[in-house]
Amino acid sequence: MAKEKKKSLGLWITLGIIGFVILLMVGSLVFVEVSINNLSTSLEQKQTEVIAAYEARSKTLEKLTGMFESKMKLNSDVFTRLEKAEAALEKAEDVKALSDANLVVDSAIDNLIFVMRDKYYYLETPEVWEIEDEIDSARSRIVLKTTDYNDVAKDYNFAIENFPGDFLSSIFGHEGTETFQIVDYDDITF
């Protein structure tokens, strides 16, 4: 009878340990899945912030182009290029398209500023300098927001590519995300 109690007690202890380990594993999987979902939500929020920074820059550009478009009729291709770039940015739906369109917009902005300074230097006023400062500020915000997005994207990609996240990703269909290309504006000179 004493041996049976020891066997029974040992069996219950073993089952308890196995049950505890299973609970820990399930709990950790749930924790990882919740973390992945939180990162996914954060990615969406960061992407919204990047788009808001693009829109703020667009409003500043409207001021600048409004001041110069009528005076720079000979260089209407500069404005056409900028309008097409802005339209491509508005149509972009994923991170890669947004990133590529942003590079085109930045190139068009640089071209506009270069033409202004080169051919229409006599039109520059303190008001224009203020708008150029606003554009620089908008670019800094874009760099900050895209860097924030990229940091979360790297965490998200790491979480879904490594165990146990990769296991959960295959079950729940999580896919990796791309990062934005970040322009180093310090390298740009006119």
Give the residues covered by each predicted segment.
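A helix-centric hydrophobic-segment signal that preferentially recognizes long
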Residues: 2-190
